[in-house]
Swiss-Prot record:
It is found in: Golgi apparatus, trans-Golgi network membrane; Prevacuolar compartment membrane. Residues 1529-1546, 1556-1570 have a biased composition (Acidic residues). InterPro entries: Sortilin_C, Sortilin_N, VPS10, VPS10-sortilin, WD40/YVTN_repeat-like_dom_sf. This is Vacuolar protein sorting/targeting protein 10. GO terms for cellular component: cytosol; Golgi apparatus; membrane. Keywords: Glycoprotein, Golgi apparatus, Membrane, Protein transport, Receptor, Repeat, Signal, Transmembrane, Transmembrane helix, Transport. Residues 1-24 form the signal peptide. Glycans are attached at N503, N1009, N1299. It is a single-pass type I membrane protein. Residues 1412-1570 are cytoplasmic.
Amino acid sequence: MRIELRSWSSIAFLFTLFIAYVVSESNFKPDIKLTKEGEIAKEYNYFDDSSNILVLRKDKLAISFDDGVSWKNVKETENERVIRYQFDPFNNNRAFAFTIDKFQYVTNDKGETWSKFEIYDPKNEKEHLTLNSIPHILFNAKNPDLAIFVVYHCPEDKKISNQCVNYHFLTTDGFKSNPKSLQTDASICTFAKSTKSYDVGKDETIYCSRNKLNSFGHIVESYIVASDDFFKTESKINHALAKSGSIIDIRVLQNFAIVVVQNDKFNTKSKVSLLVSKDGKNFNEADLKVDISYGIMTFLESSSSSIFLAVMDYSNSFRKFSLSTVYSSDSSGLSFSKVLDKVQGGSIQKVETIDGVWLANIADEIKDNKGKSKTLLDMLMGGGIDKNIKSRISYNDGEDWNLLKINNDGSCTTESECSLHLLNPTEKSGDGKFVTGPTPGILLSVGNKGSKLEKDINRMNTWISRDGGISWDFALDEPCLFSFGDQGNIIVAIPYYGKNKMNSSNMYFSLDQGKSWENVALEIPIFPLTLTTTVDGTSQRFILSGLIDSTPKDKADYSFAETLYAIDFSKAFGGKKCDSKKDFEDIYTRLDPSNDKPICIYGHKEKFRRRKQNSQCFVNELFEDVKVYDDPCECTVIDFECASGFSRSKEKECKPDKKKLANICRDKKSKKISLPDKALASGNKCKNPKEAAKEFVKTKEFKCSDYLDEDDKDKNKGNKHDIVSTFNEFDSELQQYTYVEQGETYSGENIILRTKANVAYASNNGGVEFVKIPVSDEIVTYYPGLVPGQVILITDSEKFYFSIDGGNTFQKKTAPAKPNVIGARIISFDKKDTEKFIWYSSENCDNPFSRDCSLVAYITEDGGENFQKLKEDVRSCDFVADVFEDVSDEIKNMIYCTVEDKSSRKLMLLSSTDYFKQSKKVFDNVVGYAITGNFLVAATIDDAEQSLKAKVTVDGQIFADADFPPDFHVDSQQAYTVLDSASKAIFIHVTTNNENGHEFGSILKSNSNGTSYSLTLDKVNRNRIGYVDYDRIEGIEGVIVSNIVANDHSKDRKKLKTQITHNDGGEWSYITPPVIDSKGKKYKCNGKSLSKCSLNLHGFTERADYRDTFSSASAIGLMMAVGNVGEYLEDFDKCSTFISRDGGITWKEIKKGVYMWEYGDRGTILVLVNAEKTTDKLMYSLDEGDTWHDYKFAEEPIDVLDLATVPSDTSRKFLIFGKSDRKMVSYSIDFTNIHKRQCQLDLDNPNDDDFEYWSPTHPSTPDNCLFGREAKYLRRAIGHDDCFIGSAPLIEGFKVTRNCSCTRKDYECDYNFFRDSDDTCKLVKGLSPSNRKKEMCKKENAFEYFEPTGYRKIPLSTCVGGKNFDTWKVHPCPGKQKEFNKHHGKELNSGSLLAVIGIPIAVFLLATWFVYERGIRRNGGFKRFGQIRLDLDDDDFHPIENNEVDKAINKIVKGGIVIVAASIAGFKTLRKVDRMLFDKVTSSLFRRRPGHRNYVHVPEMDEEEELFGNFRDNYEEELEEGTNNINEDFNDEPNDYEYEEETNDEVDSRLFNIDDQSDEELQSATPEDN
C-alpha cells in the first residue's frame, strides 16, 4: 500500500506539474524590447542566416546584431550619405552600401566590418565618377569574386538625354580592389550564371547588348555580344529582330536566357518580343501572341520547365491596379499559352516551397451594378472598371483554377459559389520581399468569405491554411499584418489598425500553427509598418515597427516618429526542442481535394516533415531551410508538351499550327514532313518516359502544299499565316464608333463604339477585343474631346460618364440638367484642358419650335464635379483662345457664343473672357461662325443689302472684312462653307446655285491674313447639307481634288468632272488617266483631249464615312480612290478602284469594282475590302500597291459596313465592321507579325538604310520645284518591302534642298481678277484693281507698296528672285518717303552724286583712252576700221597682239565693230517703219501711256519661246503695260461669270461649324449615315 500510495502520489505530482506547465504556457508572453526612433526608417532587412539587421534612416546606415534589440550606426559610413544598400543573393555574408560621394562600401562578414572602394570616371581615370543615379550590382551565382557595378550616368547639364549611358565596372576579387571599367559600350549586361540553375558557359561569361547610334541619337543597330574574358575578345550573337529593334533587357531566369526586344525602337510604348536561349548561343523568338510593352510585362517566379509572366493592362490611368493576363511557356521557353486573364492588378502569387501552386484574384463583371457610384477602392480593385474580385487557386501550375474552400462551414461551400477571397496572402520576408512564407504549407492571409472580395477592409478577417492554400480556417477577427517563425510554428500578427481605425494597441501570436491565438498588449500603440523575421523564417525572434504621433497634443500636426519592438519567443515551451521521431509528421503537398491524393507536377510529387500541430516544442533548427523530398511519378500525358509544328488549343490538345508547319516546310524544302505531336517536357522527372511516349505521342504526316501558297517565294506578300483575324459579335447594329487618340495618360489603340440599342463598348487593343462598358444607363451618344484620351458618354438623364484615358476608365458625373433635346451639340471641349468643357441643356422645349424653348450653356472646370451657368438662349459656344497664335492673358479664357435675341429672333455673336459675367456684342446679326486653323470666320447678315458678309479675326478681338470678289453677292438665304486653312490661306465654298439636286458654287481662296479673296475654282459640286467635293491631300502641300459640275446650265442630273491642283489652287487641271486597266486593256483615250477623257473620282459628298479620305498624312504621296476613266464621273456600279504613288500625278487601276481602302504603317500596308458585295476576303499590298494579295478573314461572307484603322494610319491593325445574319460583327485584322524587322533609318548614311528621298512636283515643271522650293520627303525605298516603318522619325529627314527662282507657278490671281481659260489672270469686267497700300504699309518696318499686277504670290511659296509677277510699280508708304528714297537711291547728296555719276564717267574715259591707245591707234587708227567690211570673216583683220592684254583689248575692239554695225543696221531698218507704229512702240515702252490690254498672258515655260520669242527678256514691260491698262473697260467682251442667285432655301447654320469638314459629328460618323 505504501508503494501504491507513493505511485499515486507520483502521478498526482506529475499531473500537477503538467497542469502548471500548461497554465504557464497558456500565460506565456514573449520578451519584448521597445526602442523609440525620431526618424522613420526606409526599410529593415536581415542578412540571410543571421540575426544581423540593416536599417537606413535619414541616409544613415545602422545595424543590429541581436535581432533588433540594440542598434548602432555603421562607423565606417558615419560621415557618408548612404542612399541605398543591397545584399548579395548568393553570398549571405556580403552586402553593399552606396553613397553619393566617391566611396562605396562592402561588408563580407554580415556587417561586422566594412571596407570601401572607389569608382573612377571611364573617360578620365584620375577623376571619381559623380553618381547622379542609384547604382546596383550584378552578381555571379557561381563565383562570388565576380561582380559588376552598374550606374546610369548623365552629364550634369543633361539629366535626361541620349548622352546618358550605363557604365559597367567589373571586379574579379570581390571588391578588394577598385572595380575597373568594363571595356564595352554596352547598354545592358548580365552574367550568364546569374542563377544557380543556369549552367551554361564559363563563370566569366557575360552577355551584353550594344546599340549603335547615329548623330541624331537614334539606334541604328542593336545586337547581343558575349565574352568569356571580360571583352578582350567577344562574339556577336546576331538576330534579325534584335538588329532592327532595340534591346531593352537581358536577364537570366532559372535556366532561360531572355532578351527583351522593343520591336519599334522609336516608340517606347510599342510591342516587345522575347528572344529565348537555353544554350546561351542560339536565341529564338518566342511566340507570345499578344501586344505587350515592356513597362507592363512582369516576369513571375518561374520554374526550370516554364517561364511565367504577367502582362498588365497599363492603358488606363490607374496603372498598376489594372487587370493582367498571365502566360506560361513550354520547357523550351518559346511557345506560350494563356494561363489566366482578368487578374486584378498584380494579385498573383506562387506559393513558396511548393511547385505548381498559385493564388490569384480574378475580376468578374458586375451584372447588378444598377448605376451605383464607385469608391476609389472600387476603381483600384477593379482596374478602373467595376468588377467583382474573386480568389482562385491552381495546384497544377495554372492548368485549372478553383475556388478557395473554407473548412467546417456548411453555410459557405464552393458548390454554392461561396468561398474565401483573399486581399493579400503575403508577408514581408527578412530580405524585403513579399512572399507567402518559407513554411511547409502554412499560409496566412487577410480576406473574407462570400461570393466576392469585399471592398471595405473593415469587413475582412485573417485566415489560415495548413495545406498550401487549398482549404482555409478562420484565424482572427481583424485584418492583420503577419510573419512566420520556426518554420511556421510561431505566427505573429498585428491588426492594421485598432478600434475606431485608431492605432493598434495589441498583437496576436500562435504557437500551434494558428489553432489558437494569444493576445499581447503593446506598451505604445502604433500604426504598424513592418513585421518581419529572418529570411528563412526559422528564427524565434521578430521585429515590429510602427508609427506614433510625435506631437499628440497638436491635432492638426502630421509629425510622426517610429517605435520599434524586438520580440523574442525563445523561452516558450521552456526552450524545448522537438523530438525528430515523436513530434513530426510527413506532409505531401498539392493534395487533390476530391481524394486527398498528391498531385504530380513536372513528373514528381513532394513531401516534407512538419512539426505536429499540438506538439509543444520548437524545431529550433536556426537557419536550416525547410527540406523538400521528391518522389518521381509515373509518366502521364500531362508530362508531355506540344512538339515543334503544333500548338496547344483551348481544349488543351496539340493541334497542327499552320504558321509553324509552313516555316518547317520552308526550312526543310520538302513536299512532305512527318512530325511527332508531343515531346516530354525538358526537366520532367517522371518515370518510364519512353514507354509513356509510345502511348501518348502520335506521329503525323503533312503535305507542304497545304501550308505553302504557290507564290510562297513572293517576298512582297509576306506570310499570310502571320496575319491574325479576330472575330467579335455585338448585340445590335452599329450606330457610331471612334478611335480615341493616344495620350500621355494612356496608350493603346482605343475604340469607343455604340450600337443602336444604346449600349457602349470599348476596346484598348485596336478592336481585337471589345468589352461592354459596365454602366446601367442607355448611352444615347458620346463625344470624343479635343485632348487625347478625353471621352464623354451621354445618357438621357443628367448622368454622364467622363474619361480622360481613352475609355479605359469612366467616372460617373451629374450635369446640372438633362442634355438638350433640340438636336444641338451637347458638349463643347477646351483644346487643352481635359477638365474644362461646356454642357448644353434645354429648357421649355417640349415643343422644340416654341419661342420659349431655350438652349442653356453650363461650364465646368473640374471634369463635371461642379457646373456654373454660362449663358441662356445660346445656339453654340466655343473656347477660342487657343485657336489664335498669340494668346495673351487677357483672352486666355475667351469664349464665343451665338445667342438668340428673343425679341428680334436674330442671332448675335457675343464674346466673354470671364464666363459671361461680362460680355461683348461682336455682331448683332449672324448666321454662325466657323473655326479653321488660326482663323475665326463669322457669317454676318447685312440687313440693308440682304446679303451674307464674312468677317475674319486672327486674335479674337479685331475683325476684318473678308473681301469677296464684288460679283459674289451672297444672299442672306444662301450659304458658304469654310473648307480649311491648312496652307496659311482660308478656302471658302460660296454657293452660287442652291437649286435642289443641282447645288454647286465657287471656291474662293484668301490671302495670308484671310481678308482678301479671289476665285480659285468655279462650279464646284456640293450636296444638300452643304458638304463640298473638296479633298486636301494630306502629307503633301498644295494638292487638292475637287469635282466640278460640267452641265451647270442644265436641269439634267449633274455631270461631274474631277480636277486637281498641285499648287494650292493656283492652277487646276483634269487628272491624266492610266493607259491600261487592271486587266491590261487600254483605255479608249487615244486621240482625245484631257477634257474629253480623264480620270474622274467620287468625292467627299458621296462618302458613307467622311473620315475616309483619298490620302493619309503619314503615307506621303499615296492616294486611293474610286472612279472611272471617261468624260464624266459614272455611277459606282461602273467604277473601279485606283491608286497613285506620286500625289495624284499618275494613277493605276487596282481592281474593277468599288472597294473601301485603308492605309497602315504609313502606307507600307494597304488594305482593300469590297464595298458592294458580301465578302469573306480582303486584298492587301505590302509594296505600296504594286502587287495585291487575297486574305480570307472570315469563315463566311459578310456585308462590310466599314474598314477602319487609327486616324494617323500608323497602326498595323485594321478593323472591319459588317453584318452577318442580321448581327453586327467586327473582325480585327492584325498585320503586326507580317514584317520581321523594322526598316532601318540612318540619317547619317541615307544610302545605306531602307528609305529614299522623294520630291513632290507639279506635273508641268521638270525641276522638282513646288511652292518655290525643292522639298524632299523620306519614304520607304522601293524593293524594301520586308520591313515596317513604325514610329521612325521621318520628319527629321525632311529637308528643303534649295529655294527656287520664282516662276508663274508661284502666283495666283489677285483680288478682283479671275483665271481665264487661257490660264491668265484677267480683271473682272467693270472693276478696278484693289489698292494694296493699306495692306502692305501696315506691316512692321514697311516703307513701300506696289500697284497690283493681277497676280499675287501663293502664301505657301518661298521662291526667291526669278520673275516677280506681283510687284512692279512701287510707291512710298505715307510718311516713308525718306526711307523709300534711301532704299531706291533717290536721295542723292554730293558724295553719292560723285559715286553714282562721277566715278563711272571717270572709269569710262580711262577705259576708252586705254582701248584707243592699245587697240585702235597702233592698229592703224579709225581709217583702218573704215576699211572693214561687215560681211567678211575675221581673217581680214589681223591686229597687233604681243601679250594677253593685247588679246583682250582686241576682242573688245572686234566686239565694238559688231555693235556699231548692228546699231547702224537697226537704225536704217527703223527708218523704214511707219512713224505712227514707231511712236506707239516708244510710248508704250517709255511713256506708259494707256493702251488696249487689260490682262497679261504668261505662257507655260515650254510655250514661251515659241509664242513670244524674247518675252523673258521683256516681261517687265509686258507687266508694266498690263498694269497701266487694266482700267480699260471693253463692252464687247462677254462676261462668262454671271450667276443666278437662288433664295428659296433657308440657310443651314451648321455649315458655319464645319472645320475641315470634320466636326464632332464627323468624329463619330456612322457608316450608314448620309
